[in-house]
């Protein structure tokens, strides 16, 4: 047995997963010279800016990403150094902690000094550009990093190969960008790397992934043609690092002073509130702001599919559901919202918060409210009639006698607002608040 090599018993070394693609795999259309500029701002000073303008060809509004370019020598140096960092730097040193950027730039600086002779034509400004791209691809989101870094963008979506990346802009709503993937394999690899960075798995056997990226952005993706005939797709729902407080919502006009005082009074008395609305209407934002009104000394338990809530409380237990990766169809190891809501009752919470109810967990939530626990949750519905109809129908199956346990329902909608000077903007408004007296008996 001497000299026998068994490489399959060796532990595979972990490598840095750079979110980078080759130039021929992604297209970034240049900014047209005669574009009609509607808005312009920097995301990374000197290196990356956003220009929103009307395309001279189609006349449509386009979100242009304009990044500093690397010349041939700078590109060669970048590829050399990024390859060395990806192979040699310990992932623990370049992870999600606050020292990641510092560690990366320190290593990049060391390697740039080492290879200065090999790349004599690269100037100091050129090395600064290289460091920008290293940080973009090793710590950020690669070609989409500028878009993700734009706080004005709420959603980023890719519908497939040779289709522009679309963004949902706070002022201009859904508009295409000048970026698109040209290669199926490159798009597949990009999704795999995003999933890897979020600690999730995606493959042909498990082609749907729902994960939380660093920065608390929510990733939903489909892999290859398993469930999406056009190939891989993804959408990234962005969230603020500092969530809106109830005061912020009042100042923005989302809710009125009277509404804020009313909700505060309800929460002080451990009442139950349900937030309803359509997709992207701001239900989670309202839910987070309401939960921040709960007394600091109370015990909170939150149950979510992905960790979106961000609360200031110390006495807070956060539960997140887990999908099964079994191949037998038995869902071995899956932990559902229903399981977590049942478990949360053993923690004796003062307030139980469910990110969104849509299944059998609703029944357990109402059981908890019946025993004196405060409750907060969201539900997809356009009005209170549809909301109650969903609650009493399968798969929620909440008894009609439990409906009065909901003290108040708030409807949040996305609306179009006039600008002070010209044009329109998009905002969120609480359109209606109901008190629930009984089944099918509501007061607004």
What are these regions (language model features)?
Residues 283:
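Conserved lysine of the Walker
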Residues 158-272, 314:
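P-loop NTP-binding catalytic core
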Residues 262-279, 289-415:
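Switch/coupling sub-region of P-loop NTPases
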Residues 139-150, 195-210, 298, 396-399, ...:
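Active-site phosphate-binding and catalytic loops of NTP-dependent enzymes
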Residues 1-198, 214:
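N-terminal accessory targeting/assembly segments
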Residues 69-70, 162-163, 172-173, 183, ...:
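Conserved nucleotide-binding/hydrolysis micro-motifs of P-loop NTPases
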Residues 408-444:
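Conserved P-loop NTPase
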């Amino acid at each position: 047995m001497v000299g026998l090599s068994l490489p399959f018993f060796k532990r595979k070394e972990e490598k840095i997963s750079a979110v980078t693609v080759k130039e021929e795999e992604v297209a970034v259309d240049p900014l047209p010279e005669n574009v009609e500029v509607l808005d312009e701002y920097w995301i990374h000073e000197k290196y990356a800016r956003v220009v929103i303008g009307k395309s001279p060809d189609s006349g449509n509004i386009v979100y242009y990403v304009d990044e500093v370019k690397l010349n041939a020598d700078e590109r060669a140096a970048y590829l050399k150094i990024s390859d060395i960092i990806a192979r040699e730097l310990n992932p623990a040193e370049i992870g999600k902690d606050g020292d990641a950027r510092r560690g990366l730039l320190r290593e990049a600086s060391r390697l740039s000094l080492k290879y200065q002779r090999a790349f004599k034509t690269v100037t100091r400004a050129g090395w600064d550009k290289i460091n920008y791209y290293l940080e973009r691809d090793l710590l950020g989101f690669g070609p989409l990093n500028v878009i993700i870094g734009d706080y004005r963008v709420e959603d980023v979506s890719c519908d497939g190969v040779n289709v522009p990346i679309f963004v949902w802009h706070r002022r201009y709503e859904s508009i295409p960008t000048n970026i698109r993937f040209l290669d199926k394999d490159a798009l597949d690899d990009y999704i795999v790397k995003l999933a890897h960075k979020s600690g999730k798995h995606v493959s042909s056997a498990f082609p749907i992934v729902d994960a939380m990226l660093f920065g608390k952005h929510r990733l939903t993706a489909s892999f290859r043609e398993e469930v999406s005939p056009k190939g891989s797709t993804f959408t990234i729902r962005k969230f603020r690092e500092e969530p809106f407080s109830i005061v912020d919502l009042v100042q923005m006009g989302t809710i009125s002073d009277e509404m804020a005082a009313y909700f505060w009074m309800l929460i002080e008395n451990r009442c139950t509130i349900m937030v309803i609305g359509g997709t992207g209407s701001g239900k989670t934002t309202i839910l987070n702001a309401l939960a921040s009104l709960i007394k600091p000394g109370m015990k909170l338990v939150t149950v979510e599919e992905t960790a979106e809530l961000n609360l200031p409380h110390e006495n807070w237990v956060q539960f997140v559901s887990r999908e099964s990766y079994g191949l037998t169809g038995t869902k071995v190891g899956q932990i559902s919202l229903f399981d977590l809501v049942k478990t949360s009752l053993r923690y004796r919470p003062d307030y139980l918060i469910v990110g969104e109810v849509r299944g059998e967990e609703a029944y357990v939530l109402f059981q908890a409210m019946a025993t004196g626990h405060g409750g907060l949750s969201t539900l997809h519905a356009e009005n209170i009639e549809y909301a109650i109809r969903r609650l009493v129908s399968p798969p929620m199956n909440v008894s009609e006698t439990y409906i009065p346990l909901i003290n108040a329902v708030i409807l949040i909608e996305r609306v179009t607002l006039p600008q002070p000077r010209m044009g329109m903007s998009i905002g969120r408004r609480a359109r209606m608040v109901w008190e629930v007296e009984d089944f099918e008996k509501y007061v607004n």
